[in-house]
Amino acid sequence: MLHKSILQVALKCSCIDMTDCLRQFLAFGAKASSWCRKHILWSVESIEESEEVQEEEHSRILPEIISMTLNISIKLLPSAAKCITVDMVHTIGDFISELLSLTESSMADKKIHGAGADIARAAPIFLDEAAKLCRVYSEAAKAEDCKMSIPDEDTTVKHSERGLASEVTRITSSTIQTLCKLGTYAASSGGSQVALLNVSWKGTVSLLQSGKGMIEEKVNVREIILTLLSLSIESMRVAAETWCTPLLETLGSSEARRAFLPIKFFLINAVRICSAYPSEAMAIYKNIIRCALAITSASILFSKKPQLKAANEALVELLEPTLFVLLDTLMKSSEVTPESKCQLARYFFENEEANGSDHMGQANREEINLPSLDCIFSMDSDVDLRNRALLPAELIVFLHFLNASPWLTEEVVIELSKKLQSLLNILTSEDIYSYVLGFEIPALYGADHSPAVVWQPVYTCLIQAMKTFMLSAVSSSAAWNELEAFLLENLFHPHFLCMEIVTELWCFFMRYAETETSINIVNQLFLLLKIVASPEGVLVPLSALRKVAHSVCIILSYASSATVDQVYTCMLNDENPSKSSVLHLALVMEGFPFDSLSGGIKELAVKKMFTSFAGYLESYSKNHRAINVPTSSWGVIGFPVHALASALQRCEIKDDSIIDEKSITTMFKFTISLINMYGTASDSVAHSVLVHFV
């Protein structure tokens, strides 16, 4: 009771100007704090029955004494911020240290904190004032350091300024450490310590920002970032475990947002610290990526449950932008070396590269289909990413970097271009390509001030990201060489999805590339077409020749008229006419875009086909309706028939003068003859001839 009475008097005196007696008040406050901490320890250890009455009285009065001590300190700190001398700062440092220890002990001890609502109100205010004091001292110390850089004859002053910086560093570092501990405690309190949570982490961030260049040796910045990441993942894990149990009702948007707001708070503070200390953040880039993968995996889990649609949309709206800003902070910083940025880009799919594409469909099949929450939300950055549960999330995060490629450095763009093959490799996994083809994911679109959540297929997101990356790669010759090699090597990828993606990229390239560039690329494709050309394969739909021709025709359908003209001219001017005919037929049968030819060349092409067909019919009539077998090894039976029939299906012919009545009559006679031959064929030779036409 005596201590309480003394503190009541001190609290009244603290309301007046204390400048002249500040040192005495600080010493008094430090002793009061020390006394309170000792009695907190005593109250925890006091368990004997004989002491129960005394303990009850003690537990009732002690919270009041602690609250008054904190309130006195709140009054003292603004005055202390005005007294910036080495001796005074040293005294204030001892005072702050005692008060921080008292605050930590009283907030963490349930026995004391549960009995004192006043402590819960006073502690955040004291911590906020302590953070303000540290910021003022940090600015003063930096200003004095600037003065020290100017030659001065007074060496005594120089010595005292160095002492000031040392004392400020001591106070600031101890304050940061206490704020982190209390912030972690408040995060685990189930939402009952919102004020303490806000003050603790905001104070931590502001002191790290203002103390940069002074506190790095005293404060483990990496550990603070890891703590925030861990809190984010743990909060997401709790929400996911709660929601992924069978739900009787659809989850509401407000409930989902309430669960995600603390996570956003942790991520925002992590972003601010990483922005101030990018080199420290880069040292733990694997943990940062792991956090991104965990939260993205949660989004993927939610997308599988219609009841969690609101949760998924809230996650994309509240968390995903901040999550990607956290990753972008490392890539944008000028303090991070290009090699470190490339190292981050190389991290994606590295386990899949180590195991090879054959591993994708073998081991861990159960883990792919039944991903565990424990695996997804593990904070161990060394967990083997061969666990398939994280691959869909890794794909989504990688697509973010492809979308961000316009502002990435050239070195990083080159590294990303080298990862495209690994991207295709993981798409061959059954569960990955089924996810790409069968799922929709939410994404933010629209103006910055009012973005809207739009659901779109994963495949669409994948294609858009790769197209964005193509546009970025053009500005770097090295990146474009990698990309061009990737497109050429995978144009005929054995997996249907990969081939579809690469073909789509080729079409995008042909649509927007300069004519000279597109002609050079198509010439390379045409050389490949010549390599696989054979008379045996031209009439076999799934032969190598027809597959290549099919891809070339799709690509040419998006090319300019000049490019299509170039390909057609190359076919006409080939040194081997018979081989040229085979190439011509393969392209025509796979849909060569005649309508994309310029006017004069298209007219010439159509006339040539009709002329060839008319000549074939004339020969057929002169031969007494016997089908000629070509003498050349490159000849194709009925070549003019196949060419014209295929062209007529896809080419719009407006000139009626090309076909006269006599030609039409001959066509019908030829068709009737083929039908009759098919019905009367008796030997293998006749049947083989008919197969070429049917």
Predicted regions and their residues:
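Charged, low-complexity interaction regions
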Residues: A81-T85, K111, G191, E216-V219, ...
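Solenoid-like repeat scaffolds
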Residues: S472-A473, E489-P494, M510-Y512, L527-I531
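Extended, charged low-complexity segments
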Residues: L226, M282, K286, T296, ...
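Cytosolic small-GTPase signaling regions in large eukaryotic proteins
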Residues: E514-I521, L527, I531-F592
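Short inter-helical turns and helix N-cap capping residues of alpha-solenoid HEAT/ARM repeat scaffolds
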Residues: S14, M18, E55, L62, ...
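HEAT-repeat alpha-solenoid elements in large eukaryotic scaffold proteins
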Residues: L2-A10, S14, F28-S50, I65-S79, ...
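Extended coiled-coil alpha-helical stalks
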Residues: M18, A30, I47-P63, P78-V89, ...
